[in-house]
């Protein structure tokens, strides 16, 4: 939940749909909670739990979508860069330690080899940078507002951005002669719509909330295009631990803050109304989710056990 509260924690080696539903349904019913949107790692049982059990949209988890691409390309590109670096060092050392008896032609060849090795290494590092840029681009695309101009995003824009990243990864893999034996790109493309639905669902929630509050058109426009971006990027800025993301969020927040301060409508509202809508906006941005909790599930369990230096019981091993 947005509060950080866990609905249910249970150790089980049975992860079929029936097991999930049997455990979650009574808990949700007891709390009076109805699920409207469920994000998961795309396990078939969890997709069925959302669509059949909860009768809601099933969203994809951003972390797992990026992780699949990272496992496919990251290690291979890192090895290529490491190999190119070693070859560049060897070539440079060979050139520097060339014997005085070496002919001018031999010295020229050694210099050419060193330059070529250095060029290959620079190219390998550039390929890595392109890979990281596109991996970051997946995260940058899945926000309710554009990082460029703070305009509202919709599912169509998100899908377009993710498809562009998919094409970039395919081009990169082709250039580096990296095969896709496990159909990683097919799996990623199958997740594009479920990733984008998080944005469209959130905007639907915003719209329904404002309709319930019976706000007029001017106030609605100010809230959705001016106030919400400021509050949203401020929250993201303090949530992320990624330095690159933090810099992007800081720029977006600064830009949105300038627009808010300069907007004529901002000056017409009394302080009490502004505080009221700030409270609403803070609540609203906490409802946007694009990944499952980092402290839940199998990965969270393993990370916690590793951090605490604890062992794995036979029951936990079966569940994992």
Regions found by a protein language model. Give the residues of each.
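RNase H-like nuclease fold core
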Residues: 1-38, 43-56, 60-62, 72-79, ...
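Helix-centered, glycine/charged polyanion-binding patches within enzymatic domains
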Residues: 53-92, 237, 244-295
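Short, hydrophobic/aromatic alpha-helical segments in well-folded domains
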Residues: 23-27, 184, 301
